[in-house]
Amino acid sequence: GTLKGIPTDDEQATGLERRT
């Protein structure tokens, strides 16, 4: 996930979203 909590392509594919 990005600094703004937006999931990357990989995270969208896996359903993960890392928020800082």
UniProtKB/Swiss-Prot annotation:
Region: Disordered, residue numbers: 1-20
Main location: mitochondrion
Membrane topology field: Peripheral membrane protein
One GO-annotated biological process of the protein: oxidative phosphorylation
Pathway entry: Energy metabolism; oxidative phosphorylation
Location of the protein in the cell: Mitochondrion inner membrane
Known function: Component of the cytochrome c oxidase, the last enzyme in the mitochondrial electron transport chain which drives oxidative phosphorylation. The respiratory chain contains 3 multisubunit complexes succinate dehydrogenase (complex II, CII), ubiquinol-cytochrome c oxidoreductase (cytochrome b-c1 complex, complex III, CIII) and cytochrome c oxidase (complex IV, CIV), that cooperate to transfer electrons derived from NADH and succinate to molecular oxygen, creating an electrochemical gradient over the inner membrane that drives transmembrane transport and the ATP synthase.
Assembly description: Component of the cytochrome c oxidase (complex IV, CIV), a multisubunit enzyme composed of 14 subunits. The complex is composed of a catalytic core of 3 subunits MT-CO1, MT-CO2 and MT-CO3, encoded in the mitochondrial DNA, and 11 supernumerary subunits COX4I, COX5A, COX5B, COX6A, COX6B, COX6C, COX7A, COX7B, COX7C, COX8 and NDUFA4, which are encoded in the nuclear genome.
Family: Belongs to the cytochrome c oxidase subunit 5B family.
Protein name as catalogued: Cytochrome c oxidase subunit 5B, mitochondrial
Organism: Thunnus obesus
